Amino acid sequence: MVILGIDPGSRITGFGIIKIHDNKLYYVASGCIRITETGTARRLKQIADGITEVVNTYAPTESAIEQIFMFQNPGAALKLGQARGVAMCTLAINNLEVSEYSAKQIKQAVVGTGGAAKSQVQHMVQSILGLSKKPPEDAADALAIAICHYHSSKSLARIAGASRVSQKRIR
């Protein structure tokens, strides 16, 4: 299983890719798509092109993205929503299902507390994946999203397995 995590942003969109083998997590790649274009349509296309390049290069089998949280500034929420929508659409065009997680769920899965600081997320991502240095914030967030997805999908698989066992016992 190869998981692509996306941390959408209107200026910087982070991506992180992990591979799972024998229930162990391995770092594959991470980085930032830095938006340099001007004009909304060109900026959104740059996000789509960057994600398409990542998908074509690393061939993820699953993807996950951070949900939008409430902003005080409606303009910022709109821009983030546009970036997130383009990211999700690009993943769907590339035949990837997209799972969504809140910032609190991601922090809980990686750090153990939903109120963790960004520096704590960076530190735990570095530790979990055995990296020699902390990844940049946006890349660390994207890797954390991928890690969260792995833990969530593993839990759901256990629940589904337990449900099948319970149904067999009932019959």
Swiss-Prot record:
Gene symbol of the encoding locus: ruvC
Top-level taxon: Bacteria
Record protein name field: Crossover junction endodeoxyribonuclease RuvC
Annotated Gene Ontology cellular component terms: cytoplasm; Holliday junction resolvase complex
Species: Francisella philomiragia subsp. philomiragia (strain ATCC 25017 / CCUG 19701 / FSC 153 / O#319-036)
The UniProt record lists the keyword Oxidoreductase: no
Catalysed reactions listed for this entry: Endonucleolytic cleavage at a junction such as a reciprocal single-stranded crossover between two homologous DNA duplexes (Holliday junction)
SUPFAM superfamilies: Ribonuclease H-like
Phylogenetic lineage: Bacteria, Pseudomonadati, Pseudomonadota, Gammaproteobacteria, Thiotrichales
Pfam families: RuvC (PF02075)
Active site: 7, 66, 138
Compartments reported by the entry: Cytoplasm
Task of the protein: The RuvA-RuvB-RuvC complex processes Holliday junction (HJ) DNA during genetic recombination and DNA repair. Endonuclease that resolves HJ intermediates. Cleaves cruciform DNA by making single-stranded nicks across the HJ at symmetrical positions within the homologous arms, yielding a 5'-phosphate and a 3'-hydroxyl group; requires a central core of homology in the junction. The consensus cleavage sequence is 5'-(A/T)TT(C/G)-3'. Cleavage occurs on the 3'-side of the TT dinucleotide at the point of strand exchange.
